[in-house]
Every structure is written in structure tokens, then in C-alpha cells.
Amino acid sequence: MLISIDHGNKQVKTIHHAPFTSGLVCSEVRPFGGETLTYQGKYYTLTDQRIPYRRDKTEDERFFVLTLFAIAYELEAVSFYGAAPVRVQLAVGLPPAHYGAQQKRFAEYFLNRGTVSFTLHDRQYEILIDEVSCYPQSYAAAITVFQTLQSSPRALIIDIGGFTADYLLLRNGEGDLSVCDSLENGVILLYNRIKSRVAAEQDLLLDETEIDAILLGRDSGQSDAVSQIVRQQAQEFVSDLLSSLRERMLELKSGKVIFTGGGAVLLRQQIEASDKVREPVFIEDIAANVKGYQLLYQAERIGRHNGY
């Protein structure tokens, strides 16, 4: 079974299940409540506390355990009850700037483990990951709107994630990996700036969900003064990000500039208010990378079948 997963620094995303925070608590004894997965004699519970940013997600087992959660959720979502072990083909991705150096290691991180047994929701799972295909983030998201990009001689994809903002230049619909990078300008940096400013000026500890509510125009329960600080910091953050891209000789006032990722959805109002981008285009689906991985895998498989 093909399962696509986006291992974000802020959230893990799949096609059929709601995103969940990239955070785990490990225990030697079964904890009370929560989403608890049992693996190799240990108990893992999802938490809203993110794993600290890791450029290399293969340094320990935590992202593998998060992958087990994602696989179980996908199997449950499609009511897949095939013979054990379930053979799984993973489609995953990495930031374009890390892709060349890390793709082999990231694929090997999931492979050669044999049959993996774990329990979630009192159900025993046995899976065998027999294939891993890795693709560049941002390009994968762009694939979901490929028909609108293939006729464009130049398009810039900007993927604003949790810890990084990745960019990739497309020429006639093809990714140019010589013009890509990952900037440490993700929304986690914005959250930290806002929390510090609000704590200093309002003596208030603001939660990230409250920040999200303010930026998305929802009821946050916060004062106008706090909301003003949040919006002002967000506008400055967007201005700094776009200036950083311009300093890298990336043209934002001609050609298509495609914004994707949860951060782009969160900051859409600030991006549209900026005078540094002529006509921003937004991919609203925060699971666009996941869907792109699936499309790329399927296209690759058809190509192999046809002898390409």
C-alpha cells in the first residue's frame, strides 16, 4: 500500500488523516489517556510539544515512531485489513536544499527493518516497509497545480513551514535545483518573536494556538493590544522573509510566485498586504506536499512500467 507522509518540523501530514504535531513523549509504563502507541516495549504518546528542530531527522527514532502513527492512521482511514505483514511503500520528502545530501540516508532510515510490529488503539499492526521514494518538498506541492505552471517560463515556489522557508525556481514547469535553498524563517521563529514581545509588553504568556487564531481572524479571546502586536510582528516577519529572498536575486514582482505550506496559509493576509510581491498565488491545501509525493510516485511507477 502506498502511503505518503510529510514529516514537518511543526506537523506530520498524511492524505486521509488530520495533521498532528511532530511531538512525542516516551515512557516505560503505559500512560493515562492520549494517543498511545506501543513499540519495542515502550509507550509513545503524541504531544503538542514539538521535537526541537533537526536538520537531519534520522538522528534518533522519534521521526520513525511518528511515521508509525501516520501509517496506522492511514490504514485505519481506508479500512485496510490485508494479510500481515502489510507491505508499505512510503512516499516522503525533504527540503530542496537538503535533498541531494540527505535523500539516500532518509530513505535508508525507514528500510531494512524487517517486519515492524506495534500497537495503536488496541490494534496490533505488522508492517514491512519495502520501498521508499523521496522527493523535493515545494516541487511536490507545485505538482498539484502543475497545469497552471507548465506554461509559465518561470515560477518561484515558496514553502513556509515550521522551522524553514524553502524556495525552488521552476522553469517551464521543471524544478531547477541550482536555484533553491532553505531559510530559517519558518513560523516557529515568528511564534518565538511574538511570545517574547507580548511577554515583555503585556506581561502575558501567549499560546501558539492563540497566535494562530489572531492571524486567521478567529476569536482568540485576547485584547486589541495583544492582537495588534501579533499582527505587527507577523507583517515584519513577512517583510523580512521577502527581503531575504530579494537579496538572493529572486524576482518577486514578475512571473508567478506560488506560496504553499501551513505558514503561507497562516500569513496570507500579511503576504497580500506586502508591496514586495506583485501577484502572489496560494496553494491553500496544507497537505499539498503529501499529495504531490503521491502523484510523483505514481508517475514514476508508470514511467518504470513503460520502460522509461
Model regions and ranges:
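Ser/Thr-glycine-rich phosphate-binding loops at phosphate-binding pockets of nucleotides
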Residues: 160-166
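Short, basic interhelical loop/turn and adjoining N-cap
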Residues: 202-206
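A contiguous pocket-lining binding segment that forms or flanks enzyme active sites
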Residues: 197
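Nucleotide/phosphate-binding catalytic cleft detector across ATP-hydrolyzing
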Residues: 1-155, 174-189, 209-308
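PRPP/pyrophosphate-binding module of the type I phosphoribosyltransferase fold
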Residues: 167-172
